[in-house]
Amino acid sequence: LAGRLLIGPWRRAAWRILERFAAADPGLREQLQAKAKGCWAKAAPETALQIALSAGCFDRDDKLALLAPLANRYVDIPLMRDAVLSSLQDEEYAFLLQLSKDEQWAQQQLPRQIFFEMLAAAVARKGDAEELTALLERLDRPESSYGWQDKALLNGLATQALQSKARAVTLAKRPDLLARADQYGPALEKNIELLAQLFIWPGKEVVQAAEKSQLLDAEGLQAFAK
C-alpha cells in the first residue's frame, strides 16, 4: 500500500505522512528509502523536493546517497538547497566531504558556491571542534592553491562568525591559519581574521581578561578623578 501511495496522485502528501511513521518503523523506513532511490530521478521537481524533505528520517548512508544527486540536479533551486540542508541534520560536514570528492562538483557555479557556503555555516553552527579543525586545516595552504570550494567554505564560516551568538568552540591551540592571516590577500585575510570569533583557545581568554581589566582600571581612574 505504501508503495502505491508514493507513486499515485497523492504522492507528495503520502511522503509527508509516511515519513512521520518511518522514523520509528525500520521496515517502513526501508521501504521509503528504496522507493526514493528508485523514483527520484523520474519525479517531478515538486515531488523531488518532498523526497528531499522526507530524507531527514532515512538512515545516514541512504540519506547522503540520495541527497547528493538531488543537490546536484536541483542546486539552482533555493527551496531544494534549503530542503537538503534541513534533512542533513548534523551530517553537513560528511556531506561536504562527499561533494568535494564528486567530479560533478568540480566546476564552479554560483548556486553551488551558495550551497557550499550554507554547508560551511551549518558546520560552524553545529560547533563540533573536530569538524571545524579539519576545515581550518583544509584552508591552511597558499592562496594560490585555493579553488572555488575553498573560498566558498571560508565565506560561509566567516558569515557565521559574524552572525553567531553561540558559545565559542574550544580548541587546544590557536589555529595555524589564523596566525598566518596576513599572508593572504585583503579579502581572504579579513575573512580568516573573522574566524577567530568562532573559537577560544588557551591564551585567548587571558588576553581578553587583560583587556577587560585595563578597561575597568581606566574607568576607575576616571571615577577617582571626578
Regions inferred by a protein language model and the residue ranges of each:
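Long, ordered, helix-rich scaffold segments
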Residues: 1-226
